[in-house]
Swiss-Prot record:
Belongs to the Antp homeobox family. It comes from Danio rerio. Residues 63-182 are annotated as: Disordered. The keyword Lyase does not apply. It holds the Pfam family Homeodomain. GO terms for molecular function: DNA-binding transcription factor activity, RNA polymerase II-specific; RNA polymerase II cis-regulatory region sequence-specific DNA binding. One of its GO terms (cellular component) is nucleus. Residues 201-260 bind DNA. It is found in: Nucleus. This is Homeobox protein Hox-B5b.
Amino acid sequence: MSSYFLNSFSGRYPNGSDYQLLNYGTNGAMNASYRDSTSMHSGSFGYNYNGIDLSVNRPNNGHFGAVGDNSRAFQNPSQETRYRQSSCSLSSPDPLSCATSDTLELKGSSPPSDQSTPTGNSRLTNSNNLTSSNSTHFADTDETNVSSETEEGAQTTTTSHTQKQESVATSTTTPNDGQTPQIFPWMRKLHISHDMTGPDGKRARTAYTRYQTLELEKEFHFNRYLTRRRRIEIAHALCLSERQIKIWFQNRRMKWKKDNKLKSMSLATAGSAFQN
């Protein structure tokens, strides 16, 4: 089975010595194969691996004769120190340790992939900063929108509350106005029936001022009967109601008739006495 596998491998890959296989022979060969196997899979460790150089001449001593010696042809001595750090725990005969390999790596020139990582990290940090700033900007705009919406809602609620209070105030003041109306002279309604009932249920006597009586007497001297228009004008001028003006003129005419009747009666008696 092993011979068939080896023959098939050599048939497929003419440069068999160029492709390294794990050799479980002696200790030195095993260590060499483990150390050199990293050169084939160096891409998995993040190093710069340019591929296998197939231009090397095929040796005459079989396919798997000297694996450790042929493997040295594919790598530079400067790269050996870097590749050896990945298998430092496996290579027992070498005195190199992880600490020394780390110091060598720090002192040596970093590969292009290592050099590209800071720039990539800086780009990532810049993109993260941009996204965070955008997110904060959007959060600020959302907060301002929310704050503006809450302020508008509060203003609408306050306006509605004030309107409700005004409506309640008007509804409460209307019955009070109906009970005790406060009517100014220029707002006085002329056909308001004022409550003039006294304590005994009778109509209270209207007390006119001297100025009102004088003005009414002057008007009665010129006109014993008033038209509706003139009555309204006098009522507004004297701060009285139309009904009060009408009643005063009725009473004044009755008094005037009574005085004239007495005067005519006295004249009649005087004339009859003179005739006799």
